[in-house]
């Protein structure tokens, strides 16, 4: 489609699934301007030019989008710049206007999925969608298994037995300060070998290793006030990461999941495998066979989106990366400016 000069803004939304690097979408024009968004090294990459500028932007924080699961993507573009959203939350912004109007009146956007990449639910919006609207259009990740009782069926337990990576989600509360207990546990052959608990130290995730030694991963903090909390344990890429209420609280080296449980035959919530119950309740829980990204985890906890706009696309002397200066507008209308004080290299 074509947009006249002076446009109020435009948005595109779609869903994609990728198992390999390759192209996603591309904007063509009658001259040499235009851009393409593709996957490189399992992360989103945007490069091209408009009538005003050229750009090549590596969205490294989106790494691992080639996991074979569906992801939502949104782009908004105005004369003030453009923003890219992954799974409902903004993941990057640029000063470039990615709209067709910035590349010429005949510019058109095309879907160009490469081999091993699927695209669905593509839509064009003749306005700039708000972060809230984009979040509402983004579906939550689909769990492999949801708990409908305090324990899983034998069939569902078998589905987990070979998983070496994935994600655990649980929403719990205890009855008040100083009350703790097990949120989720798993075992095999009568022995508990995996446990997720709220303790006086914080959130503790531990798995019994093959040499009979417990591997313990802890997010230190206090989540025992009696309020509802969302706990996510993300296991993959060589680490265990623990999120509480949508935010990362611990990144710990090591990888241990249900596949580490010898002869797995039991998975329970709200108690350990011997029946000792949490001093509170687990309202709902789910298990994912994929390693959810930050945006998907925030979506599970209904974290409000943050709207940001970059000031520069590169540092001095063409530095590809730089320490980001920032401008924050408070509710009072006061603008707070922040920047790195170092001046020794161009990145500063």
What are these regions (language model features)?
Residues 1-298, 302-303:
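Extracellular glycan-associated modules
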Residues 300-348:
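Asp-box/BNR beta-propeller blade signature and adjacent active/binding-site loops
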